[in-house]
Regions:
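Short clusters of small/polar residues that mark proteolytic maturation junctions
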Residues: 1-3, 31, 82
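Acidic, metal-coordinating catalytic segment for phosphate/diphosphate chemistry
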Residues: 1-16, 22
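Nudix hydrolase/Nudix homology domain
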Residues: 2, 79, 86-143
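A short local loop/turn or secondary-structure capping micro-motif enriched for an aromatic residue
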Residues: 5-9, 34-38, 113-114
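A generic structural micro-feature
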Residues: 9-11, 38-40, 87-89
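Short loop/turn microsegments at loop-to-beta-strand junctions
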Residues: 14-15, 55, 111
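A glycine-rich, hydrophobic loop/mini-helix early in the fold
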Residues: 14-46
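The catalytic Nudix box helix
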Residues: 27-28, 45-77
Length: 143
Protein backbone atom coordinates (compact mmCIF):
# COMPACT_ATOMS: atom_id res chain seq x y z
CA UNK A 1 0.00 0.00 0.00
CA UNK A 2 2.75 2.43 0.92
CA UNK A 3 4.58 1.75 -2.34
CA UNK A 4 1.39 2.31 -4.35
CA UNK A 5 0.72 5.70 -2.73
CA UNK A 6 4.33 6.94 -2.70
CA UNK A 7 4.14 8.63 -6.08
CA UNK A 8 5.55 5.59 -7.91
CA UNK A 9 2.35 5.35 -9.99
CA UNK A 10 2.49 1.57 -9.65
CA UNK A 11 -0.78 0.33 -11.15
CA UNK A 12 -2.68 -1.52 -8.41
CA UNK A 13 -6.17 -3.05 -8.29
CA UNK A 14 -8.86 -1.69 -5.98
CA UNK A 15 -12.57 -2.28 -5.44
CA UNK A 16 -15.25 0.38 -4.99
CA UNK A 17 -18.88 -0.05 -3.94
CA UNK A 18 -21.57 2.60 -4.37
CA UNK A 19 -24.34 1.90 -1.85
CA UNK A 20 -27.83 3.16 -2.73
CA UNK A 21 -30.89 2.92 -0.52
CA UNK A 22 -34.33 2.19 -1.98
CA UNK A 23 -35.04 5.96 -2.10
CA UNK A 24 -32.16 6.40 -4.57
CA UNK A 25 -29.83 8.15 -2.12
CA UNK A 26 -26.10 7.35 -2.19
CA UNK A 27 -24.13 6.52 0.96
CA UNK A 28 -20.74 8.25 1.12
CA UNK A 29 -17.94 7.79 3.62
CA UNK A 30 -15.94 10.67 5.03
CA UNK A 31 -12.21 10.02 4.89
CA UNK A 32 -10.37 10.58 8.17
CA UNK A 33 -8.04 13.57 8.43
CA UNK A 34 -5.03 11.26 8.99
CA UNK A 35 -5.32 9.57 5.55
CA UNK A 36 -2.41 10.21 3.16
CA UNK A 37 -4.71 10.43 0.14
CA UNK A 38 -7.56 13.00 0.13
CA UNK A 39 -7.98 13.45 3.91
CA UNK A 40 -11.30 14.82 5.12
CA UNK A 41 -13.07 14.43 1.77
CA UNK A 42 -16.30 12.57 1.10
CA UNK A 43 -15.77 9.42 -0.95
CA UNK A 44 -17.27 6.26 -2.37
CA UNK A 45 -19.02 4.20 0.34
CA UNK A 46 -16.36 1.50 0.18
CA UNK A 47 -12.91 1.45 -1.37
CA UNK A 48 -9.92 -0.75 -0.79
CA UNK A 49 -6.98 -2.59 -2.23
CA UNK A 50 -7.25 -6.10 -3.61
CA UNK A 51 -4.76 -8.26 -1.73
CA UNK A 52 -2.24 -10.41 -3.62
CA UNK A 53 -3.99 -13.63 -4.73
CA UNK A 54 -7.46 -12.27 -3.88
CA UNK A 55 -10.15 -11.93 -6.54
CA UNK A 56 -12.17 -8.70 -6.86
CA UNK A 57 -15.39 -10.24 -5.51
CA UNK A 58 -13.74 -11.56 -2.36
CA UNK A 59 -11.90 -8.25 -1.88
CA UNK A 60 -15.16 -6.34 -2.24
CA UNK A 61 -16.93 -8.49 0.37
CA UNK A 62 -13.97 -8.14 2.76
CA UNK A 63 -13.77 -4.37 2.37
CA UNK A 64 -17.53 -3.89 2.77
CA UNK A 65 -17.49 -5.95 5.97
CA UNK A 66 -14.44 -4.09 7.33
CA UNK A 67 -15.57 -0.57 6.45
CA UNK A 68 -19.37 -0.67 6.85
CA UNK A 69 -20.11 -3.88 8.77
CA UNK A 70 -22.34 -5.16 5.94
CA UNK A 71 -22.23 -8.89 5.19
CA UNK A 72 -25.47 -9.51 3.27
CA UNK A 73 -25.62 -7.58 0.01
CA UNK A 74 -25.81 -8.26 -3.72
CA UNK A 75 -23.17 -6.38 -5.72
CA UNK A 76 -23.61 -5.52 -9.38
CA UNK A 77 -20.54 -4.73 -11.46
CA UNK A 78 -20.58 -1.42 -13.34
CA UNK A 79 -17.20 -1.99 -14.99
CA UNK A 80 -13.60 -1.05 -14.43
CA UNK A 81 -11.31 1.82 -15.37
CA UNK A 82 -7.87 3.25 -14.62
CA UNK A 83 -7.80 6.25 -12.28
CA UNK A 84 -4.62 8.32 -12.20
CA UNK A 85 -3.68 11.21 -9.94
CA UNK A 86 -0.36 12.92 -9.16
CA UNK A 87 0.40 10.24 -6.54
CA UNK A 88 -1.17 7.00 -7.70
CA UNK A 89 -2.61 4.88 -10.49
CA UNK A 90 -5.42 2.42 -9.76
CA UNK A 91 -7.30 -0.22 -11.72
CA UNK A 92 -10.73 0.35 -10.17
CA UNK A 93 -13.42 -2.35 -10.15
CA UNK A 94 -16.67 -0.38 -9.72
CA UNK A 95 -19.73 -2.00 -8.13
CA UNK A 96 -23.11 -0.92 -6.85
CA UNK A 97 -25.76 -2.33 -4.54
CA UNK A 98 -29.13 -1.36 -3.10
CA UNK A 99 -29.11 -1.73 0.68
CA UNK A 100 -31.58 -0.59 3.34
CA UNK A 101 -30.09 -2.35 6.35
CA UNK A 102 -27.94 -1.12 9.20
CA UNK A 103 -24.64 0.53 8.27
CA UNK A 104 -21.95 0.61 10.95
CA UNK A 105 -18.98 2.64 9.68
CA UNK A 106 -15.62 1.52 11.03
CA UNK A 107 -14.33 4.02 13.56
CA UNK A 108 -10.77 2.91 12.73
CA UNK A 109 -10.97 3.40 8.96
CA UNK A 110 -13.61 6.11 8.43
CA UNK A 111 -14.71 9.44 9.87
CA UNK A 112 -18.37 8.50 9.50
CA UNK A 113 -20.76 8.53 6.59
CA UNK A 114 -24.27 9.41 5.48
CA UNK A 115 -26.73 9.15 2.63
CA UNK A 116 -26.75 11.98 0.07
CA UNK A 117 -29.40 12.76 -2.53
CA UNK A 118 -28.28 12.89 -6.14
CA UNK A 119 -29.17 16.61 -6.18
CA UNK A 120 -26.99 17.26 -3.08
CA UNK A 121 -24.07 15.55 -4.80
CA UNK A 122 -24.58 17.43 -8.08
CA UNK A 123 -24.67 20.76 -6.19
CA UNK A 124 -21.38 19.96 -4.41
CA UNK A 125 -19.40 18.69 -7.43
CA UNK A 126 -16.24 20.65 -8.16
CA UNK A 127 -16.21 22.36 -4.74
CA UNK A 128 -13.41 20.30 -3.15
CA UNK A 129 -15.89 18.35 -1.01
CA UNK A 130 -15.50 14.98 -2.72
CA UNK A 131 -12.46 12.98 -3.77
CA UNK A 132 -11.56 13.35 -7.46
CA UNK A 133 -12.08 9.64 -8.07
CA UNK A 134 -15.59 9.77 -6.55
CA UNK A 135 -16.47 12.72 -8.79
CA UNK A 136 -15.08 10.84 -11.78
CA UNK A 137 -17.12 7.72 -11.00
CA UNK A 138 -20.25 9.71 -10.22
CA UNK A 139 -20.20 11.44 -13.60
CA UNK A 140 -19.15 8.29 -15.46
CA UNK A 141 -21.34 5.62 -13.83
CA UNK A 142 -24.09 7.21 -11.72
CA UNK A 143 -25.42 10.58 -12.89
Amino acid sequence: RGECHSGSKLLHPVVHLHVFNSQGQVYLQRRPDWKDIQPGKWDTAVGGHIDYGENPTDALRREVREELGITDFTPRSLGKYVFESKKERELVYVNTTIYDGVISPSTEELAGGRFWTIDEIRAALGKDIFTPNFESEFTRFIS
